[in-house]
Amino acid sequence: MKKDAENENLLHAYEHDEQSSKYFIKPDSRYSIDDDISVKIDGKQLEVRKWPTLLATAMVGVGWLSNEVALAWVHERVPDDYHPLPDLFFSHFPEIRGAIRIAEYIMMILLISALLVMFTHQHRWIVIRRVFFCIAMAYSFRALCVTIFQVPVPSINTYCAPKSNSSLELVAGRVVKMFWSAGIEQLRPRELCGDLIVSGHTLTIFTAFLVFKTYAPQRLQPLSHIYHVLAFTALFSILLARKHYMIDIVLGYTVSTRIFMEYHALAASYHNRTFETNPLAWSFWSFFIPIFECDAPANMHNHLLLYNRSTSSKNVSTLKKSRRSFE
């Protein structure tokens, strides 16, 4: 024990030496952070601000509305005198029009599971704002892609409503008609075409899966393996139904997973006080991280605690002591 104490003192002196300090990453000092790891261990609920969660909710509404407006507008611009584009998946698998039902049933299962986890979580106000922000970013990017790039529909059997004009009244009427169906064809038969680039179904499916995998209790984690298989089954069904090209699915998967992972990586970096030195913080939206995370308990962002949940309370107290011994 005496030798360990001497080693700690030597390391502490080395870290604070002027010549050697340049080899260590200096923690951020711009933001105040609550490092009380005992908050979650003791099961106490932190007093968190509600307005960041309401802001994230408003951002979801704007992102979703922008998708509906984009679809209502680009329907007039979809090329209807071209055959479906060549696709590797379409070359090897036949079209099964009813397969979309499988994808949407799976999507509803994942979505309901994710919502239950979010709204019953101990830190629900923080979890909800994180998830909603990721959804808002993903769907805003999709709206941009849909607006700037239109391709022919993937199947000759796809029905598209007759084109009219792009007047404000027509676009507004289409938005009102589509808004509450949430893009689910079981709730509203598909009539408008054009929202192909970046699959909206894929964004929802994989964001819901990641929410469950990240925030579900340990006893429910075996379900995440089943949900992972179901998520890819849903993607396969979307392609069989010819609702999207394969590139739309790939883009949807990439956008949803990268945004979710990047946000949580930045949140962990923020609470580890390495936010300013993290290259991911170069993202134009990274300024939202301090706004959303400054009142979150720090132990929610520890990788071992948050994702693997393999660290016991005893290990947490040891981690807490060892971390503060070097400050």
From Swiss-Prot:
Tagged with keyword Phosphoprotein: no
GO molecular function, one term: ceramide cholinephosphotransferase activity
Keywords tagged on the record: Lipid metabolism, Membrane, Sphingolipid metabolism, Transferase, Transmembrane, Transmembrane helix
Residue numbers on the Cytoplasmic membrane side: 241-327
Localization: Membrane
GO CC terms, sorted: endoplasmic reticulum membrane; Golgi membrane; membrane; plasma membrane
Catalytic EC class: transferase
InterPro entries, sorted: Sphingomyelin_synth-like, Sphingomyelin_synth-like_dom
Coiled coil: none
Superkingdom per UniProt: Eukaryota
Principal location class: membrane
Membrane topology: Multi-pass membrane protein
GO BP, sorted A to Z: ceramide biosynthetic process; sphingomyelin biosynthetic process
EC number: 2.7.8.-
Pfam families named in the record: PAP2_C (PF14360)
Protein family per UniProt: Belongs to the sphingomyelin synthase family.
Protein name per its UniProtKB record: Sphingomyelin synthase-related 2
Organism: Caenorhabditis elegans
Taxon lineage: Eukaryota, Metazoa, Ecdysozoa, Nematoda, Chromadorea
